[in-house]
Amino acid sequence: MNIKIICVGKLKEKYFKQGIAEYAKRMSKFAKFQIVEVPDEKAPESLSNAEMENVKAKEGQRILEKIKDRDYVYALAILGKERSSEEFAAEIDKLTTYGHSDIDFVIGGSLGLSPEVLKRADTQISFGRFTLPHQLMRLVLSEQVYRAFMINVGSPYHK
């Protein structure tokens, strides 16, 4: 199985990198795990709606270039479906049972994801209505993917 987190922007914070590296190491017995960063589009502080859509479109194109045709894609979106850890684990288990060996998770930049990326996604997932920095979301998502594997093997980690 291959798990890929595709995200906009570079992760600079050492403490986030260390946390993600720890979960990547733990996941290595279950899946190949990788983070793919695409450049964020430089933009001024205040943007018109048209400029915002243009930024999302450019970032979206960069994201789509990293997704293969057969990949199963989760888009992280505030309006996506919330799942419990158990539901998420069951979903991952079901995907692998039905032959989806490449699963991508897409985290947008500060303006969110383009309509094209949302359209390409097989499903949208939400971690709640909170707004979180996308750097932190990488760590939270890494932990939840690891937790899903642990639930699926019956590990006490989830308790």
From Swiss-Prot:
Q: Where in the cell is it found?
A: Cytoplasm
* Family affiliation: Belongs to the RNA methyltransferase RlmH family.
According to UniProt, the reaction catalysed is: pseudouridine(1915) in 23S rRNA + S-adenosyl-L-methionine = N(3)-methylpseudouridine(1915) in 23S rRNA + S-adenosyl-L-homocysteine + H(+)
One Pfam family named in its UniProt record: SPOUT_MTase
**What EC number(s) is this enzyme filed under?**
2.1.1.177
Q: Which organism is it from?
A: Lactiplantibacillus plantarum (strain ATCC BAA-793 / NCIMB 8826 / WCFS1)
Q: Where is the signal peptide?
A: none
Asked if Heme is a keyword of the record, the answer is no
- Listed binding positions for S-adenosyl-L-methionine are 76, 108
Quaternary structure note: Homodimer.
Q: What class of enzyme is it?
A: transferase
Task: Please verify whether the record's keywords include Endoplasmic reticulum.
Answer: no
The UniProt function text for this chain reads: Specifically methylates the pseudouridine at position 1915 (m3Psi1915) in 23S rRNA.
**Annotated NCBIfam families:** PRK00103.1-3, tRNA_RlmH_YbeA
Q: Recall the GO molecular function terms of this protein's record.
A: rRNA (pseudouridine-N3-)-methyltransferase activity
Q: What is this protein called?
A: Ribosomal RNA large subunit methyltransferase H
Q: Which UniProt keywords apply?
A: Cytoplasm, Methyltransferase, rRNA processing, S-adenosyl-L-methionine, Transferase
> Its GO CC terms?
cytoplasm
